[in-house]
Design a protein with these regions (language model features):
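Juxtamembrane transition segments at transmembrane-helix termini in multipass membrane proteins
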Residues: 2-9, 64-89, 156-174, 184, ...
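Membrane-helix interface segments in multi-pass membrane proteins
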Residues: 44-69, 88-95, 109-154, 203-229, ...
């Protein structure tokens, strides 16, 4: 990992370099550090199997397992970043942080659902259409609010591009992490945004194509989706560390990055000398 850290500190990586370096680390983790990846794959497979049984209880359980996958995937940020930095991985409050982020996401989805339902009920025959569960008709009725919410979500998203790796791998409160994320965004927004959009498009296209294969495609999608999501976390972690290493970090953020401790160690060494 010394060579990787050296590369990340030498200068800003190009768009292609980010993916190449991330893929090399992805291969290394598949070979030598694949426990978490296998756990994610196993949970995803079981959740997918439960979702197609038609049993309401198992379908509900599959949704819960899906939430577990998201939380564990987010926790992977710290594991990847600490692996690169060759620091001892300690799951100290990480689960709570990941759960907090997940709850915020659920709260946002719940809030948007309430808005959409209210919008439908204000339309003529909206209640009847909702009760028929005609999803195509419902989506057609919601096309305008969906576009508006999509735009709002995108605008919000471009202001939190570095929040996940920061909050899940560094110290500090949620709002301190938000502030540090905003600092890292200065001049570095596109570096994270374009790869994340690319991953999103690939996932959407892949799902649409594989679902045409029926159940077989559904399970193939589980393997590919798990691999892509892990690769996405690694790529985002690489970009984040590269930005952090090549940026002049203000003293107010030293505590988050651990530089405060490094500086104190240097002072102590000089005093002993």
């Amino acid at each position: 990992m010394d060579e990787l850290r050296k590369l990340l500190k030498e200068g800003k990586l190009s768009f292609q370099q980010n993916f190449i370096v991330a893929f090399e680390l992805f291969k290394e983790m598949l070979k030598n550090d694949n426990k978490e990846i296998l756990i994610l794959l196993f949970i995803n497979l079981i959740a997918t199997f439960f979702s197609i049984t038609g049993n309401p209880s198992l379908i509900l359980l599959s949704r819960i397992m899906g939430a577990v996958v998201v939380i564990r995937l987010w926790m992977l940020y710290k594991k990847v970043i600490f692996k690169i930095e060759e620091r001892q991985y300690v799951n100290d409050g990480l689960v709570i942080r990941a759960v907090i982020l997940f709850c915020l996401e659920v709260l946002f989805i719940f809030f948007m659902t309430i808005i959409f339902l209210h919008y439908i009920f204000t339309l003529p025959e909206g209640r009847e259409i909702l009760l028929t569960l005609d999803y195509r008709r419902i989506l057609f009725l919601l096309r305008v609010p969906i576009i508006i919410v999509g735009i709002i979500f995108f605008i919000g998203y471009i202001y939190i591009l570095y929040l996940l790796p920061v909050y899940l791998s560094r110290r500090g409160s949620f709002w301190e992490s938000v502030k540090y994320n905003l600092y890292l965004l200065k001049g570095n927004r596109i570096r994270m945004l374009i790869p994340m959009i690319l991953f999103f498009v690939i996932e959407m296209v892949m799902v649409q194509l594989l679902l045409k294969l029926g159940i077989l495609g559904l399970f193939i999608n589980v393997f590919l989706e798990t691999a892509i999501k892990v690769y996405k976390v690694i790529t985002a972690s690489i970009i984040y560390l590269n930005v952090e290493y090549t940026s002049q970090i203000p003293e107010e953020f030293f505590y988050l990055t651990g530089k405060e401790e490094q500086n104190s160690d240097v002072i102590e060494d000089k005093a002993e000398a």
